[in-house]
């Protein structure tokens, strides 16, 4: 009899992913096909190894119809923010090939999932797959959506005008991206509730003071050497140096 069974999910996958993330190494190969539920399970194991002290926040990814269509899914995905990956504005980081930079809105919410504070933010993402064929939604989800670093500006008490922010990103003084706060999941107010609701369904520990990252505003651009500054109108700005 011919054995046509698909490769089974290895219990060593989560430790291998965590080791790669912590060491800045390429991800392991992904030989088994996962469902979204299985991928979230692997991600939770990965986060338990990368951040045993608990998460600093939760990030949303695949927050636009275009990104969902590209990966063949019909809803946004979530990842965890490890405490040691959160940096203050104007932080400097060594260059790493293949890294991407996103403009995002960072939130803190109340117990009902309503925004109470907001900050400008940049996210550095590294999709460090060993094989191009491994790049799909469930593998990316298992690998925590490629989250590498979060760079935060100053939080301000929530104001309704933050829902309509225009956002711009410059690299060495030249514009490289523009967008709006409502590019991601319809804007901060709507995204806060959506992220909190999905996070509870997916088993994240919703502790007080979590940072919520609402998704990319505008385009995702390659992170090159130099100085980046993102302006968020009345919310302020956030900067990053890549050496």
Name each model feature, range by range.
Residues 2-4:
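C-terminal terminal-subdomain/extension
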Residues 6-187, 192-194, 201, 221-225, ...:
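Catalytic-core "active-site belt" of small-molecule-metabolizing enzymes
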Residues 178-179, 207-208, 214-215:
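Thr-Gly-centered strand-to-loop micro-motif
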Residues 199-203, 207-208:
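Extended mid-to-C-terminal alpha-helical interaction segments
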Residues 207-209, 225-227:
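Loop/turn positions that initiate beta-strands
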């Amino acid at each position: 009899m011919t054995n046509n069974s698909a490769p089974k999910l290895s219990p060593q996958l989560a430790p291998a992913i965590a080791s790669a993330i912590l060491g800045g190494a390429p991800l392991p190969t992904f030989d088994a096909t996962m469902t979204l539920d299985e991928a979230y399970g692997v991600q939770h194991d990965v986060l338990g190894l990368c951040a045993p002290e608990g998460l600093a926040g939760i990030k949303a990814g695949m927050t636009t119809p275009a990104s969902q269509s590209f990966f063949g899914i019909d809803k946004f995905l979530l990842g965890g923010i490890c405490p040691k990956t959160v940096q203050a504005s104007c932080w400097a980081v060594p260059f790493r090939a293949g890294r991407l930079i996103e403009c995002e809105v960072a939130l803190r919410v109340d117990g009902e999932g309503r925004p109470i504070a907001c900050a400008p933010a940049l996210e550095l993402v590294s999709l460090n797959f060993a094989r191009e064929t491994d790049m799909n939604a469930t593998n990316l989800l298992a690998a925590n959506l490629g989250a590498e670093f979060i760079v935060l500006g100053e939080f301000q008490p929530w104001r309704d005008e933050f829902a309509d922010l225009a956002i711009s990103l410059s690299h060495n003084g030249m514009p490289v991206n523009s967008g709006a706060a409502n590019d991601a999941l319809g804007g901060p107010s709507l995204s806060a509730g959506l992220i909190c609701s999905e996070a509870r369904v997916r088993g994240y520990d919703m502790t007080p003071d979590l940072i919520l990252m609402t998704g990319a505003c505008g385009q995702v651009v390659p992170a090159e050497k130099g100085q980046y500054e993102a302006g968020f109108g009345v919310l302020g700005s956030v900067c990053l140096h890549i050496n």
